[in-house]
Amino acid sequence: MAKAKFERTKPHVNIGTIGHVDHGKTTTTAAITKVLADAYPELNEAFAFDSIDKAPEEKERGITINISHVEYQTEKRHYAHVDAPGHADYIKNMITGAAQMDGAILVVAATDGPMPQTREHVLLARQVGVPYILVALNKCDMVEDEEIIELVEMEVRELLAEQDYDEEAPIVHISALKALEGDEKWGKQILELMQACDDNIPDPVRETDKPFLMPIEDIFTITGRGTVVTGRVERGTLNVNDDVDIIGIKEKSTSTTVTGIEMFRKLLDSAEAGDNCGLLLRGIKREDVERGQVIVKPGAYTPHTEFEGSVYVLSKDEGGRHTPFFDNYRPQFYFRTTDVTGVVKLPEGTEMVMPGDNVDMSVTLIQPVAMDEGLRFAIREGSRTVGAGRVTKIIK
């Protein structure tokens, strides 16, 4: 079957279901696809519960994650939806960024109210920077008493407020199972949930709208022309004759001008996020730049050496360490295109970290790296990946 061409006519938003085990995340996902397929058959196809629940294994930086991707459209938007069935899968996905979310649907069973994993998922969503959460209060067909539902709503709002999410976020009453079975009343509630997503999850900021940033992967000298650096543009756009800074790894940053942009052996006037290209740099010698530095719009980014990060440590089965590590552990931190050694400080009260754990740690790097909150990294020992994480706070 040929891959369908991705039509870029509507805004594209990445979304996901989060919440406690057995509260109905996967059933909610299946119900959304069914109800939208019934409402807009030309735009959507229904995905059965089983096809979502048997999530295929994905490898992201050597970590195995079971995760399902479905897509659907409302009149306003195109959504890519991720559902991580297992609790461990959810944590791994959030930290490694196998699927990034622009917004999340927190599924809470009205029969139970918020449970420990509900709280943990919301905390993790905040840590990894999911911008918006709204709520699907599921299994409402099983609760007769309005007062119970009101109490659950209050608890959910408190939980959102604790993590600085919108306390006034929509809480839509649903019965995912009834909607899946074709019940008209509950089908309407799923449409209301999608309307709430359309109206409340903000449009994501596209990478092209951010200031220019390209990590250097390779460096060449072209006789008579100068030094060319190659890499994939991560953010923003760049035009020929723009000034740029080369930052990170070395103590001092360097300023230069881009005199040529090349892609697939063709000369271009500009490059934008997603492009693999070569940049010809004025007056720069080959030894002035190295892999792992980044080319940026002047003043837009700064290199740092100290940060806090949220980390998932690979289990032995995933090819990680066989033994725990302790305070002052010194692995390499792989940012974008290069490894930098760092010293780990564990949080107060944490003696050691076991393979398979997730942990918040402070890191001091021996060389500066251009970073901001949300930047992902791998932790390596030699060529072996032993962990994955993301920057949650910059210290220095």
UniProtKB/Swiss-Prot annotation:
Alphabetized UniProt keyword annotations: Cytoplasm, Elongation factor, GTP-binding, Hydrolase, Magnesium, Metal-binding, Nucleotide-binding, Protein biosynthesis
tr-type G domain mapped to chain residues: 10-205
Location of region: G3: 83-86
Chief location of this protein within or outside the cell: cytoplasm
Alphabetical list of Pfam families matching this protein: GTP_EFTU, GTP_EFTU_D2, GTP_EFTU_D3
Binding-site positions, GTP: 19-26, 83-87, 138-141
Annotated binding of Mg(2+), by residue: 26
Region (G1): 19-26
Location relative to the cell: Cytoplasm
Superkingdom, taxonomy of origin: Bacteria
Region G2: start-end pairs: 62-66
SUPFAM superfamilies: EF-Tu/eEF-1alpha/eIF2-gamma C-terminal domain, P-loop containing nucleoside triphosphate hydrolases, Translation proteins
Region feature (G4): 138-141
Catalytic activity: GTP + H2O = GDP + phosphate + H(+)
GO cellular component: cytosol
Subunit annotation: Monomer.
Function of the protein: GTP hydrolase that promotes the GTP-dependent binding of aminoacyl-tRNA to the A-site of ribosomes during protein biosynthesis.
Family of the protein in this entry: Belongs to the TRAFAC class translation factor GTPase superfamily. Classic translation factor GTPase family. EF-Tu/EF-1A subfamily.
Stated name of the protein: Elongation factor Tu
Organism this protein belongs to: Corynebacterium glutamicum (strain R)
